[in-house]
Amino acid sequence: MPEQEPVPPTETTSPESDTPESSDAPAFDPRPILARMPGLPGVYRYFDADGNILYVGKARDLKKRVSSYFNKTQLSPRIAMMVAKIARIDTTVVRTEAEALLLENNLIKALAPRYNILFRDDKSYPFLRLTGHKFPRMAYYRGATDRKHQYFGPFPSAHAVRESMQILQKVFQLRTCEDTVFNNRTRPCLLHQIHRCTGPCVGAISEDDYARDVSNAARFLQGRETEVLEGLQSKMEAHAVQLEFEQAAAVRDQIAALSTVLKRQAVEEVGQARDIDILAVAVQGGRACVNLAMVRGGRHLGDKAYFPAHVDEAAMIVEEGDEADGSAHEGAAADTDQLPIDRIAARVLSAFMVQHYLDQAPPPIVVVSHRPADSALVEALSMQAGRKITLVRQPQGQRKTWLEMAAQGAGLALARRLAEQGSQEARTRALAETIGLDLEDLATLRIECFDISHTAGEATQASCVVFHHHEMQNSEYRRYNIADITPGDDYAAMRQVLTRRYQKLVEQLQEAGGDPAGDGGDGVPRMPRVVLIDGGKGQVEVARQVFEELGLDIGLLVGVAKGEGRKVGLETLVFADGRPSLELGQGSAALMLVAQIRDEAHRFAITGMRARRAKARTTSRLEEIEGVGARRRQKLLTRFGGLRGVMAASIDELASVEGISRTLAEEIYRQLH
């Protein structure tokens, strides 16, 4: 598709935007801005009186679409509730509906409006990487790609990458060790002994033979299995003709291993092998699930489920707006018998595809369970990718099987989520009632929990985990390295982490004009409604002092004190504002949620502390040995590939390193064992 010259969008803002609505201010009058609004493609944004974003929408005809919200006398209760909150309207005019669709979803991802279908940002997808080394290393990789190495994927999950790596290790025996280990190894590792690596580090395989294995592995990952099998067959026969029966047997084992793998996997027929995404949607109980299955080179790599927020409200809003300006997909609009649940699925699918493929181009073929609701979707995705994207609604053969598998996976994942959500919402409600929180929407309850972890004062680290929208928000977790305190002083560690966390937050709120005691507005950092402290009265008192120094509400603070004998279920909630402590009992739903969040904070702190401690010990153990300076330490680490190699070396091997005497080698060995 030829690239279009970008045209600057035209922005319009309602005049009411400069006058926040007060309790006695007149109701918002949309007529002035509607009178000036053009009948052109574009994006509109609704804001409430506090400047919070309510909704972002796109339209083929802005005037018709926006007017429809204010002209209708019969609006659904949820849409009427949103319209009643509107205090400002911003619009952006673009050239085409496809451009409007892309801009709309850029804004949705950036602003996260209350009434839009939202898919949470996830980590970037992982790849399998073959490095550009003379003897390429096979590795799991996540991040930006470059031209120095070969990348295969993306894969839907880390498990899918590691599963493929295990296959390649078994069939082609490629190395997985770090280059520093590879360059300094003097004897083969365990992987060579169990036939999972050909041992290029010690010259057990020639550069040419290893390069052939790498080439075969790359072809396998590209879906060219037949070429690989034919090449191996020819190689085996050539060895047999030369009476090289041992080499022929090794190639025969490769063929057998590869054939076994191919029988287990669902692979598309030769000649049809393509990169394909399969998208299946399930809708139930006001929630939805999009299951994305990835096929690369004709091989099914696995799937991953996504769960959007605000499904009901957003689907209704878009549905009514589409009828006003004719933006609905022609096929969908003509299907008067389409069930409401299918229309919601179509909306969810459209939202997912645009939000998901904004940051990464889709493959040439996307198989879908429902016809997407937006007529401009294919054009927008093709424009974004710079090539034609084909949607397949009714696949045949292996692709049909894959779609059925994805649909079944979506249904099962949604059923699990609904069951979990029911119990989780009940726990959230129980906790809110127990500690006296007055919330209109339980999903807005934001809880931050802190824990301190160390080993006898070494490598002290604090963790902060976040619970919001009835689930843990992994992307918002933070670790804090604690320094300049007496080792083992948990009170000082808690004071330091709380000060660092909330002093910065208060400053950000003040810069943005927000209220530290409030929830923040659009783009403004948000204070939690509850701050859980893993500890009893002493820890809570430290937290109270920090909050008072920062001018924060001490009523947010709740300590989780361990019960008698540290038994689970006997915990007590300790409040900083003078309320009496609460013993909830083992059957308490509120305590279950508190324990879940606290245990997650503890897990997160422990893993960070262990990693930090291991890193510190890796560098410090040799530093502590008298006579081993920086130069000798570097020679030892280079020769043996790291501290583990040094620890595994004998006294004779240590003494063979330049600059290490027999006496010093004995001392090093004694100190490390």
Curated annotation (Swiss-Prot):
Q: Which NCBIfam families match?
A: PRK00558.1-5, uvrC
| Ranges for domain UVR | 226-261
Q: What is the protein name stated in its UniProt record?
A: UvrABC system protein C
Which Gene Ontology terms cover its molecular function?
Answer: DNA binding; excinuclease ABC activity
Q: Where is this region: Disordered?
A: 1-32
Which family does the similarity line name? Belongs to the UvrC family.
User: So what does this one do?
Assistant: The UvrABC repair system catalyzes the recognition and processing of DNA lesions. UvrC both incises the 5' and 3' sides of the lesion. The N-terminal half is responsible for the 3' incision and the C-terminal half is responsible for the 5' incision.
Locate the compositionally biased regions of type Low complexity: 10-23
Question: Subunit structure of this entry?
Answer: Interacts with UvrB in an incision complex.
Specify whether Transmembrane helix is a keyword of the entry: no
**Gene assigned in the entry:** uvrC
Q: Which HAMAP family match?
A: UvrC (MF_00203)
Q: Which GO terms describe its cellular component?
A: cytoplasm; excinuclease repair complex
Any GO BP annotation:
SOS response
Organism classification:
Bacteria, Pseudomonadati, Pseudomonadota, Betaproteobacteria, Burkholderiales
One Pfam family for this entry, by name? UvrC_RNaseH
Please state where this protein is localized. Cytoplasm
On whether Isomerase is a keyword of this UniProt record, the answer is no
Primary location: cytoplasm
The GIY-YIG domain covers 39-117
Give the UniProt keywords, A-Z.
Cytoplasm, DNA damage, DNA excision, DNA repair, Excision nuclease, SOS response
